[in-house]
From Swiss-Prot:
Listed name of the protein: Probable tRNA pseudouridine synthase B
UniProt-listed NCBIfam families: CBF5, PRK04270.1, unchar_dom_2
Keyword tRNA processing: yes
Species assigned in the record: Methanococcus maripaludis (strain C7 / ATCC BAA-1331)
Cross-referenced SMART domains: DKCLD, PUA
Amino acid sequence: MELIVKEESKTDYNYGSDPYKRDIKTLLNTGLVVIDKPSGPTSHEVAAWVRNMLNLVKAGHGGTLDPKVTGALPVALGNTTKCVPIWHIPPKEYVCLMHLHDDAKLEDIENIFKEFTGRIHQRPPLKAAVKRSLRIRKIYEIEILEIDGRDILFRTKCQSGTYLRKLVDDMGEALGTSAHMQELRRTISGPFYENEAVYLQDLLDAYIFWKEDGNEEELRKLVKPLEYGLQHLKKIIVKDSAVDAVCHGATLYSSGVSKIEKGIGTDEVVLIETLKGEAVAVGKPLMNTKDMLKTEEGEVVEITRVIMEPGIYPRIWKKRNKNDKTKAESKKK
C-alpha cells in the first residue's frame, strides 16, 4: 500500500484510538473472529453460538455455508455486523471433492474444467433462499488437484454468490456422466483465510480464561478489530475535523482529506480511515487518486455505508439549512 500525502495533518489522541489498542470489552463489540466451521451446524447456528459464548447482543456470519460444508466462516461481533456486506466484495476459494456417476476420459475432464472457467450462467438450486433467476458468476480459477477413479479433487476461486453444488452438477451434466458434490471446504472467504480460522472450543477457552483469570492475551489473538476485515479496500485518510461529518453520512470533501492511496479509480469501493487507522466509512470515489490530489475543493467520495459511531470525534461541522443550499446552487448557476 502506497499512501500519497495531500495535506499533512496531526491527530488528537484525546479522541478515538489505535484499533489494535482498544480495551477488550470494546474489541468484543467492534471485532471479528474467523471460525473453522465444523460439519453439522448451520452458519447461523455457529454465529449464534459465538454470540452466546461471548455474551454479546448480536453477531452475524459473513457468508453462508451449508451444514455439511466446513472451513473459514468469518463472524462479525456486535457493531461489526454492518461490515458484513463489504466482506463479500473479494472472491472466495474452495476445495471440493466431486464424484462422477460414470467413467470419463482424463482429456474430457480437463476440457470441461476449462469450459467452466470465466463467466458462467447459474440458476440457484431449489433449496436456495433467493429467487431462482438465471445469474452470471465468475470462476476466476479452477484447478484439478487429484483424480482417483471417479473422484475428482479440485480447487476453485470464484465470485461471491457462486453455488458450488450447482457448479458440480452442471459440470457433470456437460461431461455426460452426471456428478454430485461429495465434500466441500472453504479455504478463503473474502479477506479471510483458512489458516487463521479458530475452533469454537478454543474461542470459548480463551473467553473463560479472560473472565476467570483476567488474562486477555489468548482472546486478543483470536478476536481481530473490524479494520482487519477491511484490509482489501484501498484507503483515503481523513483529518480529525472531517471524521464526525462522515459519521453522520456527509459526503467527503477534498478539504477533509489528508492522504490518498495510489491507484484509486471511480469503479471501486474505498475505505475512509482516521489518522489512527480507524475505519470511519466506505464509499464510492467520485474521482481517481490523481484528480483528488489536484482538486482543492468539491466532493471526492460519496459515502455508502457508515461504520464508526457518531460522537467519537468532536463535531466541527455545521448543518446546512435549505436556504444555504439554495444560495449555493444559485451561485453555481
